[in-house]
Design a protein with these regions (language model features):
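Active-site groove signature of glycoside hydrolases
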Residues: 133-156
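Short, flexible, mixed-charge acidic loops at enzyme active sites
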Residues: 94-107, 251-255
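An active-site-proximal structural segment forming one wall of the substrate-binding cleft
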Residues: 119-140
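Active-site mouth loops of central-metabolism enzymes
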Residues: 24-36, 110-126
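Short, well-ordered coil/turn segments that N-cap beta-strands
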Residues: 15-19, 49-51, 76-80, 138-142, ...
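Conserved residues at the C-terminal ends of beta-strands
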Residues: 22, 32, 56, 144-147, ...
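Beta/alpha (TIM)-barrel catalytic core signal, keyed to glycine-rich beta->alpha loops juxtaposed to Asp/Glu
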Residues: 4-5, 37, 149-344
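N-terminal binding-site loop/beta-alpha segment at the start of enzyme catalytic domains
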Residues: 1-101
């Protein structure tokens, strides 16, 4: 698999596989997953050439980190990039909060019986990293991201104060760890292109993970954030490139777009993209993945999986050669931003 390299602000070098493994689904995302399958999924990633493994305390309240660590136990540490996030502290004695109706809240069916508590402070970041290392079973992380500090997660009233808390607290902590080379790189993991811009301008970050805002269906990240990331020399890890499902499944009944049933306008657009893909003998899933990989600011596309076979499919689709005429036909049909960089 293609490898992409970048150098962090502290001089540390990182090598990314074009396709990474996102471990959110291993935290019992939407459905329970047995331990053996979860660990085998991570092990298959290693065997298939995946070298980027991303997690978060949020995923199953720490369960995904634990499973990822078990799957990486025999990995050669200097040949993989391990990423996790801060912003939530897991309390084994706390009450789980009620789901708020004013924010998007994709559900976990299982996970550890711990209560998450938002904390973007200096001490909270340090504590979160310590807890993550214990769950994963490592003595260091390569990348640490400020997680979900956006309107998507906190609602409009709380997003601003949370941003200020993160920049005054967590960012200072992460910058200290980076300067001391305890971590190689620091960044943020956000669901909104505008908030990515806000963070990129506010701090001196190495990497960013943007979810769902650069895909075949949503190219809002192309307008300002991706050019800004290139200008600042940031590596971009893309997540959510299938927009939570529909670009992987195609226009099947009940297909999901951004964690909800896709509206008719999205279904129609997907059907039109599928037709162009059929003419070029590729799947919409392959096109969605290859489109994301093609942007020069992107160092890795992080893909979820719940079985070893899904990992194999991800790696295969990340390596399929796309005909240049596919992209030109999509642009001619106004199904793709004409300014979007493409390969082939």
């Amino acid at each position: 698999m293609e490898m992409r390299r970048m150098t962090a602000r502290n001089g540390e070098s990182l090598a990314f596989s074009a396709a990474g493994l996102g471990t959110g689904p291993l935290g019992d995302f939407f459905e329970l997953l047995d331990e053996k399958t979860a660990i085998s999924t991570v092990e298959q990633g290693l065997a298939s050439g995946v070298r980027v493994f991303d997690s978060s305390p949020h995923y199953g309240n720490g369960l995904a980190e634990s499973r990822m660590g078990a799957g990486l136990r025999r990995a050669q540490r200097d040949q993989i990039v391990v990423s996790s996030k801060i912003g939530r502290i897991m309390d084994p004695f706390g009450k789980k909060p009620e789901v708020r109706k004013d924010v998007v809240s994709p559900g976990f069916a299982g996970g550890f019986p711990h209560a998450p508590r938002f904390d973007y402070s200096y001490d909270g970041a340090m504590r979160s990293i310590e807890h993550s290392l214990l769950r994963i079973g490592l003595d260091r992380l390569d990348i640490v991201l400020i997680h979900d500090c956006d309107v998507w997660t906190h609602g409009r009233d709380d997003a601003g104060p949370r941003f200020k808390e993160a920049m005054a607290g967590a960012y200072v902590a992460l910058d200290k760890l980076r300067r001391e080379k305890v971590v190689k790189a620091i960044g943020f993991g956000i669901n909104e292109a505008g908030t990515c811009v806000k963070f990129a301008r506010a701090g001196d970050f190495d990497v960013a993970m943007m979810a769902g805002r650069y895909s075949l269906l949503d190219q809002t990240g192309l307008q300002e954030f991706l050019p800004l990331a290139s200008e600042k020399g940031m590596g971009v890890m893309l997540a959510g490139v299938f927009n939570s499902g529909i670009l992987a499944t195609g226009s099947i009944p009940g297909a999901k777009f951004d964690y909800a049933v896709a509206p008719e306008a999205i279904m129609t657009r997907v059907k039109e993209i599928e037709e162009v893909c059929r003419r070029h003998h590729v799947t919409i899933r392959q096109a969605a993945l290859q489109f994301a990989i093609a942007h020069p600011a992107v160092v890795s596309v992080v893909l979820g999986a719940v079985t070893p076979d899904e990992v194999k499919a991800n790696v295969h689709d990340a390596s399929v050669e796309m005909p240049a005429s596919l992209w030109s036909d999509l642009k001619t049909a106004n199904l793709l931003n004409s300014a979007a960089p493409t390969a082939g």
